Amino acid sequence: MFAFIIGQVFSLASSVLISWKFGTSVEYDAFIAANKIPDIIYQLVAAGALASAFVPTFTGLLTRGDRERGWKLASAVVNWVTILLIGICTLSAIFSPWIVRNVLNAPLLNHGVVDASLADPLKFQYTVNLLRIQLIAPILFGISGLLMGIINSHQSFLWPALAPAMLSIGKIVGVLFLAPSMDIYGLAVGFLLGALMHGLIQLPALTKLPMVKYFFTLGKDLPETREVVRLMGPRVLGVAFVQLNSLVNTIIAYGLPTGSVGAIGYSFGLMMIPEIAIAQSMAIAALPTFSAQVAKGKPEDMRASLSALLRGLLLLAIPASLGLIFLRVPLVTLLYQRGTFDGHSTQMVAWALLFYAAGLVGHSVVEIVSRAFYALHDTKTPVFVGVVMMSFNVILSLWFAGLFTRFGWMPHGALALANSLATFLEMCVLLFFIRRKISGLEGRHTLDGLLRALAAGAVMSAALWAWLQWTQPLSVWLVAIGGVLLGVLVYQIGRAHV
């Protein structure tokens, strides 16, 4: 977890520098919108195979001692992913103007909440150019992500956990050294540099693995390759709906007043700091562990591991969620309000963070529970649930955006609220199905952990509310940092006495 915390420190540092340089400007809106397309390509082609199909299959081969077949499978998956990503990214670069004009400017999704920014030729040109630059990233991330899965399958987590920090360092280099002469394009080039370092930092760990071999093969003669494709199919469908939901949110925000896309990006990034440090660090380590327990025919061990992870997760995610909700304004002010990031930008980001923070627990639990399904070679259940809930999210996003506009509220907050509601429902349904699948979740222990976290969280919330009332006229440094320290202290005391 320490490596993930280091990664989030660098991520936060890069966000602070980006906000100082670009704020919630048209240029940064274009950068975030352009970044969405490469991210979708990577998630569909590489991440789906990695999370649900490749790691469990590869881990199973390692557990059975068939290392050569495992490396043939790994080589085949790397080769296929690289070929597909190069082809898709090349075509996307050629048709970038069409993608921006007809996808990011989709008129049906912007109906009723669109402003004049859609007719801004500068915003359009920024987005097209940034999209073409960033389309190199999915190729780099595809290879790097598979290396991460290979290394994690050997129960080695340090170097892969440090990889996200490299991406943030690349962005920092882009802001400090490239943006002064290249403007927003400097950030895009820094992003590519970070993507390259994301893979390079994992090479030392890869070279230390036993019997590492690379084969020039597409694995057509391997039944495990077909198994990966079989498992990947439903997962790709699920990822497609998740990414469609994310794309719809970006499209809606792209048509809202200037700064909405950036505000969504900053606020979601702040929510993701505890989510990555707590939930994703646990989930990445959990998948190989769950897969090995299933391969050894010990589902009861997996049930115990999952229950323990959920209890630990709730004890950390609940106070993190409440802390972000209460301290959102001083935290955003302290971290971002400087340079081109003004008071209005702070209000926009804090408004979205209010709703995103409410969904932190849901996002965190889904990260863990979905890994349990993948380890059981069941990709259909989480995909089906994800498709239904993400479709619900799209509907809520469109409906809430109109309602918020009608009430005179900043409409980008509607997208965050819809996301949190849909994710909470997804969490509940996945917990119901996994409980049936593995014959329980040690419910009494899990419920006890939940109630203790909620009780201590309630005490912490009362303390933070009083703190904010008392410290209103004081320095934002004192309010934010003191609030965090107070929250941690009160929560720990509360946990010890409930």
Regions found by a protein language model. Give the residues of each.
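Membrane-embedded alpha-helical bundles of multi-pass transporters/translocases
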Residues: 1-497
